[in-house]
Regions:
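Catalytic cores and adjacent flexible loops of soluble metabolic enzymes
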Residues: 1-229
């Protein structure tokens, strides 16, 4: 499994970061087990990965507190965020403001570039770190890179906050479900909200097209029945 692979890679002399996907899907008991396994491997870094962009401030507080109290103090703690709820910059600030007694890292991308809805805009958190933590990131260089290389790409392939991806995050579902229903072309955001609200939790993490289509047909049939009534 992933832990065994990380252990073997570390034994080869590489710096290892362990990044469990969808950390919001784990119970506190699961997280404690993960931290125990991570301590046994003792990697360079452990990353809190908000895979589905569903993390809120209270979730960050809980998970960071558990990680800080249970991970070995020399393991760096990192944060990887998505922009489903337009909270990535807020959460990154909260994380850095904790001033934990361990090394911290936050990753992002210029202009938040990434598969829609995108990631934390790295220029925002770099500027925040300059202002509050005494860092010296060159914002001019980032602005030049955005103008010359990233902005033209956004004209070809859009990313950023959209309501449908907020809804998938709201229910902590795989983002492909939102994309699937958007591609139908005949659903409003209200429709998508109602369909996603009815998802079985066992289908949340791994995208299941057949299941998504079944719920779509059931929803459409109910809509027809309501109209007839």
């Amino acid at each position: 499994d992933g832990m065994d692979f990380a252990r073997r890679i570390k034994e080869l002399g590489y710096k290892v970061s362990i990044n469990p996907i969808n950390i919001m899907g784990y119970s506190d008991k699961d997280l404690l087990w993960i931290f125990e396994q991570v301590n046994a491997i003792h990697p360079w870094q452990f990353s809190i990965v908000d895979t589905f962009g569903s993390m809120r401030r209270r979730d960050l507080e809980r998970i960071v507190s558990m990680a800080d109290h249970n991970l070995a103090p020399d393991i760096r703690l990192a944060l990887h965020l998505h922009e489903n709820m337009a909270l990535s910059f807020c959460l990154a600030q909260e994380f850095l403001d904790k001033h934990l007694r361990r090394d911290l890292a936050v990753d992002g991308s210029l202009m938040g570039m990434g598969r829609i809805p995108g990631n934390l805009p790295i220029e925002l958190i770099a500027d925040y770190m300059n202002e509050t933590l005494g860092c010296h990131y060159d914002i001019d260089e980032m602005m030049d890179a955005i103008q010359d290389h990233i902005a033209p790409l956004k004209g070809e392939t859009a990313w950023g906050y959209t309501p449908a991806y907020f809804l998938s995050a709201r229910y902590n579902l795989h983002r492909d479900y939102a994309e699937h229903y958007l591609d139908k072309g005949d659903l409003t955001n209200r429709d998508i909200n109602h369909i996603l609200a009815g998802f079985d939790r066992s289908k949340a993490t791994a995208y299941d097209k057949d299941y998504a289509d079944r719920l779509y047909r059931e929803y459409q049939n109910r809509a027809v029945d309501d109209t007839a009534a």
